[in-house]
Amino acid sequence: MEIAGKIACFVVLCMVVAAPCAEAITCGQVTSNLAPCLAYLRNTGPLGRCCGGVKALVNSARTTEDRQIACTCLKSAAGAISGINLGKAAGLPSTCGVNIPYKISPSTDCSKVQ
């Protein structure tokens, strides 16, 4: 193999090794993004900054795995946090002008989210 070929192989190898690994979204990120929505979802406060968090979450959940993780976190929160208006939770994406491929509900089957 000539020297130029070896250099090309080395450069490609370095690019593969140095490529950053994309990490999946976490429940911490999901809850952090949606924390401003809690008062609204409990009927105790305005929508306020909630939609900014919803939009940030949608932008963060780019892969199927991310969307399934986000769905699972939201499903768990919807069932565990007392006083949440589940109708408002389900309508949150449309209220904020975004689309998500699942309903925010304790009954959502997150394994089917694409």
Curated annotation (Swiss-Prot):
Tissue expression pattern: High expression in leaf epidermis and shoot apex, and also in root epidermis during seedling germination.
Leader sequence residues: 1-23
Highest taxon listed in the record's lineage: Eukaryota
InterPro entries xref list: Bifun_inhib/LTP/seed_sf, Bifunc_inhib/LTP/seed_store, Plant_nsLTP
Gene3D superfamilies: Plant lipid-transfer and hydrophobic proteins
Disulfide bonds: 27-73, 37-50, 51-96, 71-110
UniProt similarity note: Belongs to the plant LTP family.
Full protein name: Non-specific lipid-transfer protein 1
Species of origin: Nicotiana tabacum (Common tobacco)
Lineage: Eukaryota, Viridiplantae, Streptophyta, Embryophyta, Tracheophyta
Gene: LTP1
